[in-house]
Amino acid sequence: MSHANPVQFINGQWQAGLGHDVSSSNPARNEVIWQGKTASKDQVNDAVLSARQAFESWANISLEARVAVVTKFAELLAENKDALATTIALETGKPKWETTGEAGAMVAKVAISLKAYNERTGTVENPMPGAKAFIRHKPHGVVAIFGPYNFPGHLPNGHIVPALIAGNTIVFKPSELTPRVAQEMLKLWEQAGLPNGVINLVQGEVETGKALASHKLIDGLFFTGSSNTGHILHEQFAGQPGKILALEMGGNNPLVVKDVSDIDAVVHDIVQSAFVTTGQRCTCARRLFIEANEQGDAILARLIEVTKNLTIGYYDDEAQPFMGSMISEKAALSLVDAQAKLLALGAKSVLDLKHLEVGTGFVSPGIIDVSDIIADIPDEEYFGPLVKLYRYNDFDKAIDEANNTGFGLSAGLLSDSEASYNHFFTRIRAGIVNWNKPITGASSAAPFGGIGASGNHRASAFYAADYCAYPIASVEAEKVSLPETLTPGMKF
């Protein structure tokens, strides 16, 4: 069946895709909620050209005029927050309590981005003899933005808002798993009064993404997603130093527990680190280090008890669940497969991760002890509620193993000892390091990013302003004049 729904937004016009049929389903109930056609290569080209045509006028209007449009978008977000939260929940399977928070974070992002623009990329003036020195910033031009499915509103919004404030124009390619959320977002930008071509939406799968990423007329690409895709983009951009590439990828994140008095508080933070958003946050704890002693045994026993009792359910249940569905049945089965492979290597199941309902993304959280097979464990991000358990005797060796990864996004220590945290902080390699807080907790008022396979030193959140504009250094005087002292060897 062919779907001529106008799901592409190019040069201010909604139009049907010219590619093949695609659809999006609610992963909790296996119901189709969106249908359309992918953007063709020609449509991607049209989107880039329209962004290129719109760039000069958008970049050259006053900052106040750009801010007015972005502020109007924030107002529309606030007015439509509940509807957007429902759409996010419907398409991702996340509980409504969580998607309401995501929609709220999208509203707050505008004020934070304005503050970041002024603090990090505003204009700085310094006096110097006979002149003034200025630091100003200019937008890059046309930027491609690739969004993920786990936070399909908040994370691309974290690229889009600062990029527009800086004066860039955009071609946005959302995850093919969350096209409906992207479409609702773009309708709000349209209502906010963005000029035609300033933001464009191209819906599609891998082919659409390749056509956009490889387009010669884009000046940069901002990506949030898997490490595998990020590495492909990095290779594709090699030899193009004139293009800005900002990558925010995943992590194989360690959470270490040492010498704690409040076991319930520790278990709470472990659960929030490993299983919130059904384990589908890039900052989720993938590796849990617990001491091999009596206290460690007590912590593990309580963790198993609490995890078994976590409520799993539909996003719209009146009594809201802790965990909803994963993004798809395919994603759920990939976690079941990952668990099976670890068991085949010799790991021991502490709590089985189970696929709960055929045709859906529902799984139960799992804990698997890998203490005896450390040398054989693949350095992979299992993007879901499956945490690998390491029992340890030596704190420094635990930190060594925590660092034994090519990733470097988030890490944390749960400990009553500040000295232990200071030691941990000094040695651990990650872009986000927390003490006695879940490692999934991050602030939009701080940078967000990792090292190694987790990113390319282009931190987002508050530091997104840095990759949305480039600095211009100027020395300026009102008229040309001879210096008081001539350079040796010159005569006038």
Swiss-Prot record:
Biological processes per GO annotation: arginine catabolic process to glutamate; arginine catabolic process to succinate
Alphabetized Pfam families for the sequence: Aldedh
Catalytic activity line of the entry: N-succinyl-L-glutamate 5-semialdehyde + NAD(+) + H2O = N-succinyl-L-glutamate + NADH + 2 H(+)
Molecular functions (GO terms): succinylglutamate-semialdehyde dehydrogenase activity
Alphabetically ordered keywords of this record: Arginine metabolism, NAD, Oxidoreductase
EC number: 1.2.1.71
Annotated InterPro entries: Ald_DH/histidinol_DH (IPR016161), Ald_DH_C (IPR016163), Ald_DH_CS_CYS (IPR016160), Ald_DH_CS_GLU (IPR029510), Ald_DH_N (IPR016162), Aldehyde_DH_dom (IPR015590), SuccinylGlu_semiald_DH_AstD (IPR017649)
PROSITE patterns: ALDEHYDE_DEHYDR_CYS, ALDEHYDE_DEHYDR_GLU
Broad EC category: oxidoreductase
Active site: E248, C282
List of residues binding NAD(+): G225, S226, S227, N228, T229, G230
Record's keyword annotation contains NAD: yes
Pathway: Amino-acid degradation; L-arginine degradation via AST pathway; L-glutamate and succinate from L-arginine: step 4/5
Summary of the function given for this chain in its UniProt record: Catalyzes the NAD-dependent reduction of succinylglutamate semialdehyde into succinylglutamate.
Family: Belongs to the aldehyde dehydrogenase family. AstD subfamily.
Cross-referenced HAMAP family: Aldedh_AstD (MF_01174)
Protein name per Swiss-Prot or TrEMBL: N-succinylglutamate 5-semialdehyde dehydrogenase
Gene it is expressed from: astD
